[in-house]
Amino acid sequence: MKMDSLIKELNLLWEPVRPFLVTQIEELYGRQDGHILEIGPFGGLIFALARKNVGKSFSIAAFPQAAIALYRQDARKHGLEDRVRIIETNSSLTGIVDESVDLTIFRGALFFPAIFQVDFKAIYRVLRKAGIAFVGGGFGKYTPAEVISQIRKRSEQLNDTLGRARVTIESVRDQLRSSHLEGCCEIITEGGLWVVMRK
């Protein structure tokens, strides 16, 4: 399968998880305003946030190339092509203005080094003061077991085909240390492996 087909299937498969992950993100963010940025190919959470009116403006930092057309299709499907701006970029967030984002979401960030490397410094750079980033992966703490069980096997197959790496808490800590950002980040393991970054 081509990468765009794999990404498309994985994002469709995860649609039932989105409302539950969004609940966790809403809880962390604690606001209804601000600019929200979703990063990378494994997304769609931004559409759920926009429909719930969590945030005032919305952008997607779309990469790799295979993900860009998929996001445009998704925006049309959800009737949000006028509200969600799709920016062609890379994992260093080239073209995203410094200190312009209040909430950043990057699902799948830690697990696909064959496709991209997570750039924690870039994520910190684009956050406004008091901004928050939710970076990592997993089903989230509110997704019911029955929803997880329906998609787990196929999700694992697709992730493995895309080159998912096994990541430890210590390896994530090492990345944060090397980025000199460990002081503003918390690693949480409830519902996956996530880094919560606060500026």
What residue ranges belong to the model's regions?
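A short SAM/SAH-binding and catalytic strip from SAM-dependent methyltransferases
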Residues: 102-117
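Conserved class I S-adenosyl-L-methionine
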Residues: 134-159
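Short alpha-helix
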Residues: 162-180
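Class I SAM-dependent methyltransferase Rossmann-like catalytic core
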Residues: 1-19
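Conserved alpha-helix/loop element of class I SAM-dependent methyltransferases that forms part
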Residues: 14-34
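A short acidic, Gly/Pro-enriched loop at the edge of an enzyme's catalytic core
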Residues: 92-104
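A short glycine-rich, Lys/Arg-flanked "PGG" loop and its adjoining helix->strand segment in the class I
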Residues: 117-132
